[in-house]
Amino acid sequence: MDHRLLEIVACPVCNGRLYFNKEKLELICKVDGLAYPVRDGIPVLLENEARKLGVDEITQ
């Protein structure tokens, strides 16, 4: 994931910062506890496509 893209994308729910998880290919919103998938290098920033994070994942 291009670091420049991370500077301009935001969580569609809260407009907060997103963090890239290289291992799971997801963009993480720690505020809402959501993980958005990245498919073929393209972030899928749709709330209904997001995965709810567990408490242990949010604190990482």
From Swiss-Prot:
Signal peptide per UniProt: none
Top-level lineage group: Bacteria
InterPro entries cross-referenced by the UniProt entry: Trm112-like (IPR005651)
A GO CC annotation given for this chain: cytosol
Similarity comment: family membership: Belongs to the UPF0434 family.
HAMAP family documented for this protein: UPF0434
Protein name per its UniProtKB record: UPF0434 protein PC1_1771
